[in-house]
Amino acid sequence: MAEPGICDARAQCIRLGALCESFLAITNIGTAVVLWPIVKRQSETLALSYVASRVVESIIIVVGLISLLSVVTLREDFAGAGADAGSLTIAGKSLVAIHDWTFLLGPGFCVGVNGLLLGYLFYRSGLVPRWMAIFGLVGGPLIFASAIAVLFGA
């Protein structure tokens, strides 16, 4: 990290990744909004739960994204200003830890819930072949269980 060019390139990569994650958060909500009129005919409660869960997932993703962009700002604005290196390291590691936890909660837990809800709605409605809906019914709980395992250090 001693060479400024390397740091600038890494910051640009993080910014590009942030742009992609922003697009992900927007499309998560867009997917739920597009599916809302279709799946609400089966169960308005489950359809609303799906939309709410997608919104929560997107919010969690954005929180993690903000923490990662804060690390870039911390590096660019304060590291060169002669701030205490130990304090900056602790703050940076804390912000990265926030990103890691939000990655577990958003794409971990919420995706499992979303898969289960959507799989059940599609299974009941017959909008997709049953075998395809079963992927959501089986995959959702597996993703959720995987996130729980990671949460407890497995």
Protein language model features and the residues they cover:
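Hydrophobic, aromatic-enriched alpha-helical segments typical of multi-pass transmembrane helices
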Residues: 1-154
